[in-house]
Amino acid sequence: MRASIKSAPVLCALFSTALFSSVTWACEQPASVCFQNNEGLPLIKDGQPLPIIVSPSADPAVKRVADAFSLDIQRVGGTRADISQAQSLSQPAVIIGVLGEDTVIDELVQKGKLDVSHIKGQWEAYQIAVVKDPAPGVAQALVVVGADRRGAIFGTFAISEQIGVSPWYWFADVPTEQKNNVYITAGSMQDQPKVRYRGIFINDEDPALKGWAQKKFGGVNADMYERMFDLILRLKGNYIWPAMWGKAFHLDDPKNTALADNMGMVMGTSHHEPMTRAHAEWHRKSENPAGGGPWNYETNRENIQKFWRGGIERMMSKGNGKPYESLVTVGMRGDGDEPMSEDTATELLEKVVEDQRAIIADVTGKPAAETPQVWALYKEVQDYYDKGMTVPDDVTLLFADDNWGLVRRLPTKNVDREGGFGVYYHFDYVGVPRNYKWTNTVQIGKVWQQMDLSYARGAKDLWVVNVGDLKPIEFPIDFFLTMAWDPEKMDTQALQEYANNFAKQSFGTGLANEIGDLLQRYGTFAAMRKPELLNQHTFSVGEISAPKLKAGEFYQHYVKWQKLEADMQKVKAKTEPEHYPAFFQLVEWPIASMSNLYEMYFAAAWNQKLVDAGDARANYFKKIVEKNFAKDKALTDKYHSINDGKWDGMINQVHMNYVTWNDPDQQTMPTVSAIHSAKNDIDVAFEESPLPPSTQIIQAADYIKASDNDEMEWTKVEHLGQAKAGVVILPQGSGPTSIDDNVSLTYELTQPYYGDATFTIELSPTLDTYARGGIRIAVAIDDRPAETLSFDLHATGGAQHTPEQKAWAQAVINNKHSLQWNVQDLKKGSHKLTVYRIDDNVVLEKLKIEFEQKAEPEAESEFAVSRFFSKLFGSN
């Protein structure tokens, strides 16, 4: 029977980055950190900390977090807290333990001094309380009690975060501000997660993370994972799919398995690695002396079953009939994360899972349902599910995005099934239409929209995100795991404040808003198009003219990146030296490297165009390209040398001049040429062309009227999509509405002359998560009947054959999808355009209207009327 994860009353969930509070506000909240003496419990007084008490019989994970907390106190106050295993209180102290497993805490509960009714039996719940008179002669004590071992961990790290220790203190070198006095206010607070399993997938880790780990730790080993597990737990995550490119977590370092369990982590294996077995193990002689044979369940069933049994036996090798805590992946894909044969029947996959569950039951000695399991509906496996594949009720069904951040399918039935549902999401990917592995290209607004929808539709049991090398995707990882802890708290206001709060935690209050703005703008710009998809042909470059060049779309992107980099440099100049290593990693390098890449391709495009025209200005752009190519290497070298080379090798992904979906072998500069007979000091300038009168652009957020209903309302969400703001209906997850329901937005437009109009409605791309044949909206002009428009993008992991697959590929390449609608015979003047909601998961970004003038029908013209009366009454 699983521990309950139902919501317990929460007095004050203060301890997350998204809700990071001001000191004044925190001092008014119960059981909260305060840096002013408000008669609270002094955690640190004049640099001296309270001792920490932990039970001698405590779980190793609880002892480890007590030790980590002692070090965190030292980071803040300068002195490490003493750790005691005393079974009674003789002075004020910090008591860390698990309900029912800690003598001191249990006695406080029995004496009525600590009410734990809100967390008892709740999955990973914790309570932080200042207890008065906990023992004779002791005025007060700070109790951190977990309903289970991870509850105790999360409660302890919650305090660490609020006293100023960032979860990224090691993985991004975020410094800790020194405090001589730290107090905990009176009272009690509780918190617990809304999503059961919350984790990351380390993937596509060659050459970056692998090369870095080899230099830093001697390999992807327990020393590296100890740092990574610490980060995940501080971010209130509990789950990981470990690195798997040629790696085997349980074999590569004998210490890995026990380390994960001793730190409180839940181990898993990726979507195509069943029964706790890494894919690499199948081909290792130590596990398969005969080499394993073909990964084909129809022809090699006996060997595969032996292999799987070995995985479950290893999971149960902890002793005393207890497993190393795991979430067991079931199911099967082809060898090397490929689809199984095209004629694979649904019945075979059902048989695979049936046999796997029989092995689980046999090895554990318990019904299979008592071992947590997950079946990933990834790529073609989702198709089998759509066609009726039967899945045991206790197995968590893990839906997936399309590898580009668009969730493919969500629950439509049995939402309350025992195993529940989850989502596998991507911040990194290797596959069509192009790999993206180099840098952070995540817009957290899009993550919020897709995961908020997923949660609303019932995906509440597992959220796991592919993070590639982990760096440099720190900010989106922080957001994803914070949201996973409590999606209900991550409303649009919390979303908009998130970047500023992350910056405040990382760099202090002074520059928080400026850095937050840089992070938001970067996320929006970078998400528009993956850098691996950029080249000199990506955007229209403009036209050759004199004395100034006529700018095209490429110039607009170049300018906004240059402005962002200039703004970053201004903030950098105000950054304190102790914050600079973190600033470089989290802010400067991402912005400078992407700005540099855009400038390089922009210059390469103009060089090519001007050389073809024999224009000497080509030489200016040739120099720019060469400068940019050198700067890219210099930025990489600086990243690898900062903090005495701590991150050497981490930013080694090839990211220039892709030709196919897969990455090139090495960095190459775009081809440039010179006009040798020309001067090299020619000035270059640009002029932008105004929007023609025949074109009007309206931001989706600039509606003149929003018609809601009692259950849903239109909401503007900044930094969602590429426009001023994305406009969505909240709450998400509701069923269809009709045109008669009039859940709509109204826009005003001006037709410059009589004629026709072509409307282009730009949307943030989304997928039909119901498999109902597409997503619909309706549009109407003035009082004319509404027309329904729809789109149905079909994600594919291979070649795009159908129109729907080709449309999907273009949508993820450009990070937008457009619908077109033609309207005939509009009179000159003002008109009202109405956009109606029909289906969920629509994000409106922008409206573009192109007008085409034509002759007004004679019967309606003034000339026609005059001629009619002339004929009727006669004229000379």
Predicted segment positions?
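Structured mid-domain segments that build the active-site/substrate or prosthetic-cofactor binding neighborhood
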Residues: L233, N238-W241, K247, F399-G405, ...
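An acidic-aromatic substrate-binding cleft motif
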Residues: W168-G218, D223-A243, G419-G422, S694-I697
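Gly/Pro-rich turn-and-neighbor structural signature
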Residues: P175-Y183, L251-P254, L259-N262, P294-E418, ...
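C-terminal non-catalytic alpha-helical accessory regions
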Residues: T176-K179, A499-H655, V743-L745
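Aromatic- and acidic-residue-enriched carbohydrate-binding clefts of CAZyme catalytic domains
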Residues: R198-A208, K215-V220, L231-R234, D261-M263, ...
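Extracytoplasmic
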Residues: D663-N876
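Contiguous, structured surface segment used for ligand recognition
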Residues: C27-Q192, Y753
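Bacterial N-terminal signal peptides
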Residues: L11-S21
